[in-house]
């Protein structure tokens, strides 16, 4: 359709003479293959659904602005943080994790919290969740997590048995499971939850000094959550309640905000840390590593087209900028390949050209001249006729050695190390988290756990009770009571290796 006169055309500009009536042989005859407009439309329709994300398929997004409110240049020379008051355009996408594109927003689930900052040194993607930890610490388990929380291959239904069988087979998962079964496992909406980078990352400054960091984003709207009963009533009326809440707030000028903080750990502190500081199943205690304010982001513009900006948004932890870097966190290392690879499958090799993914602070003519061709390459004239190799006699495409990162500390031989032999302290932190809850909040953890374990076999329930008891005896007793299981009939002293190996 021509935007100027509102007249309908086909995809290549030819006027459409009749939008409603197909071309036929006679008034009531069969269709003619020369009705090219119909063929063009139906063939496009047949192909317009792209693969959904393997996780985080149901999501909402908005554009906004990040503003620096505190000087952290002692830790990083990243330009996004170069001065107080500096603003950077950004995009955020929130999501559930387990459900498909049409799933309800209010499920007891982790929420995705993905941010894309359009800096002058390129895009910085911080791909996190609304929880500071995860179920495990080795990426080889990620595929099984996907299988366990999604649909059963025989019934094609989600299976609490599969879910809990997997979770309770990993004692280190209890920390994340405790958060998930707590009030924060059912946020009222995306505006009313905190966000976390979750992984350990690093920063480095002009002197080449590296520190390890964790990112925190604290909602300025306040934490609000639903009970299972409240959520069930809302889902019956509105499956898109979190998306609607975010969209309507922005449309009405009630712009949501989050304050950004970091925790900082020096390399020397990391060497002496009692646990593995790169273990995604654990937090750094704030009393030891206090929150340092960095800035605030505000979401103030809804996308004009959901598919263009939200469905096609592509986040990858490999998208970082000078002054920011990775860590030895094995889960982060595993994501460095997986995310970009998934986007290339889902959106194509040139998905960086999609407007929401384009670097805004770097001219497209300067972007990687050796990555050419591929389906739907159009944005930068495919780098024109310039050299597509290096070295060349034109003196272009030179490296930028001033952006070399400081040496990345590593040690040891390449080997499949058993991480359980490195650290089997699975229950200290979930126990502390449980004891921080009010008595009412503890009761809701028990109730939520019983609801979530409905239909799960007794042996799996017993395994979970045993883990909870090891975190705190009252935790185990409360879950057992909610599940109507006599805790006195359970062997609570089974060691962890046996628990993991035998699932008993």
Swiss-Prot record:
InterPro entries: Catalase (IPR018028), Catalase_3 (IPR040333), Catalase_AS (IPR024708), Catalase_clade1/3 (IPR024711), Catalase_core (IPR011614), Catalase_haem_BS (IPR002226), Catalase_immune_responsive (IPR010582), Catalase_sf (IPR020835). Pfam families: Catalase, Catalase-rel. This is Catalase. Transmembrane segments: none annotated. SUPFAM superfamilies: Heme-dependent catalase-like. Keywords: Heme, Hydrogen peroxide, Iron, Metal-binding, Oxidoreductase, Peroxidase. It comes from Staphylococcus epidermidis. Its EC number is 1.11.1.6. PROSITE patterns: CATALASE_1 (PS00437), CATALASE_2 (PS00438), CATALASE_3 (PS51402). Belongs to the catalase family.
């Amino acid at each position: 359709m021509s935007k100027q006169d509102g007249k309908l055309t086909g995809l290549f500009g030819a006027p459409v003479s009749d939008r409603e009536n197909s071309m036929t042989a006679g008034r009531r005859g069969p269709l003619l293959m020369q009705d090219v407009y119909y063929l063009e439309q139906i063939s496009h329709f047949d192909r317009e659904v792209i693969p959904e994300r393997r996780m985080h398929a149901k999501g909402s997004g908005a554009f906004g602005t990040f503003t620096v409110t505190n000087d952290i240049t002692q830790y990083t020379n990243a330009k996004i943080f170069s001065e107080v008051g500096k603003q950077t355009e950004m995009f955020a996408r929130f999501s559930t994790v387990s459900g498909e594109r049409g799933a309800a927003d209010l499920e007891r689930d982790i929420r995705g919290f993905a941010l894309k900052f359009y800096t002058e040194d390129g895009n910085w993607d911080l791909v996190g969740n609304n929880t500071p930890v995860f179920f495990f610490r080795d990426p080889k388990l990620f595929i099984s997590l996907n299988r366990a929380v999604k649909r059963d291959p025989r019934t094609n239904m989600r299976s609490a048995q599969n879910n809990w069988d997997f979770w309770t087979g990993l004692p280190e998962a209890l920390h994340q499971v405790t958060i998930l079964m707590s009030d924060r496992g059912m946020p009222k909406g995306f505006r009313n939850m905190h966000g976390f980078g979750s992984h350990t990352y690093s920063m480095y400054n002009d002197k080449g000094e590296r520190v390890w960091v964790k990112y925190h984003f604290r909602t300025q709207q306040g934490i609000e959550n639903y009970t299972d009963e409240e959520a069930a009533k809302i889902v019956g009326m509105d499956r898109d309640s979190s998306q609607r809440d975010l969209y309507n707030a922005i449309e009405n000028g009630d712009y949501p905000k989050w304050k950004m903080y970091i925790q900082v750990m020096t390399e020397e502190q990391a060497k002496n840390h009692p646990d593995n500081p790169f273990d995604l199943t654990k937090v750094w205690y704030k009393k030891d590593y206090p929150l340092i304010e960095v800035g605030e982001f505000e979401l103030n513009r809804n996308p004009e087209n959901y598919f263009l900006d939200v469905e096609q948004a592509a986040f990858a932890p490999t998208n970082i900028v000078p002054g920011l870097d990775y860590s030895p966190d094995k889960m982060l290392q595993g994501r460095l390949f997986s995310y970009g690879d998934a986007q290339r499958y889902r959106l194509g090799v040139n998905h960086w050209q999609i407007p929401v993914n384009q670097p805004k602070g770097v001219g497209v003519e300067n972007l990687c001249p050796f990555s050419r061709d591929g389906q739907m390459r159009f944005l930068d004239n495919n780098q024109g006729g310039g050299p597509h190799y290096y070295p060349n006699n034109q003196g272009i495409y030179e490296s930028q050695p001033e952006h070399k990162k400081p040496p990345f500390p590593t040690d040891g031989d390449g080997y499949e190390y058993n991480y359980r032999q490195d650290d089997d302290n699975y229950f200290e932190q979930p126990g502390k988290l449980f004891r921080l809850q009010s008595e009412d909040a503890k009761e809701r953890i028990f109730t939520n756990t019983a609801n979530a374990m409905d239909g799960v076999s007794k042996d799996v329930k017993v395994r979970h009770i045993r883990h909870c008891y090891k975190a705190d005896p009252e935790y185990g007793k409360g879950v057992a009571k909610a599940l109507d299981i006599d805790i006195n009939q359970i062997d609570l002293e089974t060691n962890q290796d046996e628990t993991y190996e035998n699932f008993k």
